[in-house]
């Protein structure tokens, strides 16, 4: 019984570390210009949702295509940084993540906030819903 209780207590911290690892891998992939590897953090599903700029895009391929168009070269991609990451476990297989993003580019530094819903899938923790907003440029 004690082993079962310990395993249950350890799971949330393991899950948080696994989710943080997904975000770290995404940041690394982005910063080497690899959008396809960045997209490995998202669930490869038609139900994956990305919300930004007053538009909801549905489906992993649609989200990937949006990134490819918007960030078509390394100059547009810049260097990505995440900060103020807060992971809240909703259940043993779901979590919400709140954080900040920032791109450092030659002529600007767009930044904003994001809320992600992660789900534990057979292939590991993946983003199933991403709501990202940019701060005003003022």
Locate each region found by the language model.
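A short, structured loop/turn motif at beta-sheet edges
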Residues: 87-95, 118-124
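Short, well-ordered beta-strand segments in beta-rich or mixed alpha/beta enzyme
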Residues: 26, 48-53, 94-104, 117
């Amino acid at each position: 019984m004690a082993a079962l209780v310990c395993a249950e207590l350890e799971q949330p911290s393991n899950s948080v570390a696994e989710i943080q690892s997904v975000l770290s891998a995404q940041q690394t992939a982005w910063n080497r210009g690899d959008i396809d590897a960045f997209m490995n953090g998202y669930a490869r599903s038609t139900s994956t949702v990305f919300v930004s700029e007053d538009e909801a895009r549905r489906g992993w391929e649609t989200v990937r295509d949006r990134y490819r168009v918007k960030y078509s070269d390394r100059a547009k991609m810049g260097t990505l940084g995440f900060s103020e990451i807060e992971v809240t476990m909703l259940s043993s297989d779901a979590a919400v993540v709140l954080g900040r993003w920032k791109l450092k580019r030659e002529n600007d530094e767009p930044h904003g906030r994001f809320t992600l819903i992660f789900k534990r899938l057979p292939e590991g923790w993946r983003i199933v819903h991403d709501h990202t907003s940019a701060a005003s440029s003022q």
